[in-house]
Amino acid sequence: MVKLTSIAAGVAAIAATASATTTLAQSDERVNLVELGVYVSDIRAHLAQYYMFQAAHPTETYPVEVAEAVFNYGDFTTMLTGIAPDQVTRMITGVPWYSTRLKPAISKALSKDGIYTIAN
């Protein structure tokens, strides 16, 4: 007969090796912060491309928080809280390289953080 403590220890060991995951709505602020973190990093890495896009599309504006985060090389995540989810979606999907560069990077970052999204 197997002792209950042995079963509990086995379950605890399995649970410790499994990655913790969280399922969140796409509009959840934690999802938005991951998306914005990837977005800011992409702007930093491809600044000239974003400047050219901005020049060609002057009505596509960025919240001041995003601009400050791009040029502040410290911890910028607290600057990005409070940006509306629809504005986050508009910014990140509004550039031509969204599906080739941003979407895969966002998916990877969310997965790395154990976050999976569901449609709102």
Curated annotation (Swiss-Prot):
It comes from the Eukaryota. Residues 1-20 form the signal peptide. One of its GO terms (molecular function) is structural constituent of cell wall. One of its GO terms (cellular component) is fungal-type cell wall. InterPro entries: SRP1_TIP1 (IPR000992), Yeast_SRP1/TIP1_CWP (IPR050788). Keywords: Signal. GO terms for biological process: fungal-type cell wall organization. Belongs to the SRP1/TIP1 family. Seripauperin subfamily. PANTHER family: CELL WALL PROTEIN CWP1-RELATED, SERIPAUPERIN. This is Seripauperin-6. It comes from Saccharomyces cerevisiae (strain ATCC 204508 / S288c). The lineage of its organism: Eukaryota, Fungi, Dikarya, Ascomycota, Saccharomycotina.
